[in-house]
């Protein structure tokens, strides 16, 4: 792979990773430990490897009509997660709230990586080099997710108890933006 072929993939990886960065800002406003932040970033990175890989494999066989479905599903997942965070911030005590682990972490990672499935479909149709592409997507998304989580964590300190509500609203807003782009 030449440098000229690598540059568009790096740009695409940053574009896909910005989804993870944006929603990680909101997720970072939850009360998270450093270990949880690292785990969330790694999970997002792994999903940004798995989803485009599946998309690239299927892209060789399927039409482009599934791109809109993936985009819609990702938006709905983000909106649902955002409402859940707002709900839990308002109605639950700090002690009873849990960090995103288990299924909620996978739902979050799936939601921010589903757009990479659509990109994988397109890249699969055009025969992009799979290994380099998915590793770039995963690594850059992981770094951007960590950046968003750390920034969100520090912003929560400035926003006080309203930080998680703001984070949930960011997720809802981002999901709505995916559904209804301006």
From Swiss-Prot:
Membrane-traversing stretches: 6-26, 37-57, 71-91, 101-121, 131-151, 162-182
GO molecular-function terms, A-Z: manganese ion transmembrane transporter activity
Major localisation: membrane
InterPro entries: Mntp/YtaF, Put_MntP
Recorded topology in the membrane: Multi-pass membrane protein
Keyword Nuclease among UniProt keywords: no
Stretch forming the signal peptide: none
UniProt xrefs under Pfam families: Mntp
UniProt keyword annotation of Cell membrane present: yes
Cellular component aspect of the GO annotation: plasma membrane
Family assignment from sequence similarity: Belongs to the MntP (TC 9.B.29) family.
PANTHER family with a match to the protein in the record: MANGANESE EFFLUX PUMP MNTP-RELATED
Function: Probably functions as a manganese efflux pump.
Name this protein carries in UniProt: Putative manganese efflux pump MntP
């Amino acid at each position: 792979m030449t440098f000229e072929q690598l540059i568009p993939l790096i740009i695409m990886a940053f574009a896909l990773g910005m989804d993870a960065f944006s929603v990680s800002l909101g997720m970072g406003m939850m009360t998270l430990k450093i270990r949880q932040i690292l785990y969330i970033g790694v999970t997002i990175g792994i999903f940004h490897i798995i989803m485009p890989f599946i998309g690239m494999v299927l892209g060789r066989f399927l039409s482009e009509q599934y791109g809109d479905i993936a985009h819609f599903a990702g938006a709905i997942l983000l909106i649902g997660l955002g409402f859940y965070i707002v709900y839990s911030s308002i109605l639950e005590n700090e002690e009873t709230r849990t960090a995103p682990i288990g299924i909620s972490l996978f739902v979050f990672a799936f939601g921010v990586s589903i757009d990479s499935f659509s990109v994988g479909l397109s890249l699969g149709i055009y025969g992009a080099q799979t290994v380099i592409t998915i590793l770039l997507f995963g690594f850059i998304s992981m770094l951007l997710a960590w950046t968003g989580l750390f920034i969100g964590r520090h912003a929560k300190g400035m926003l006080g108890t309203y930080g998680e509500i703001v984070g949930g609203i960011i997720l809802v807003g981002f999901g709505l933006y995916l559904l209804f782009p301006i």
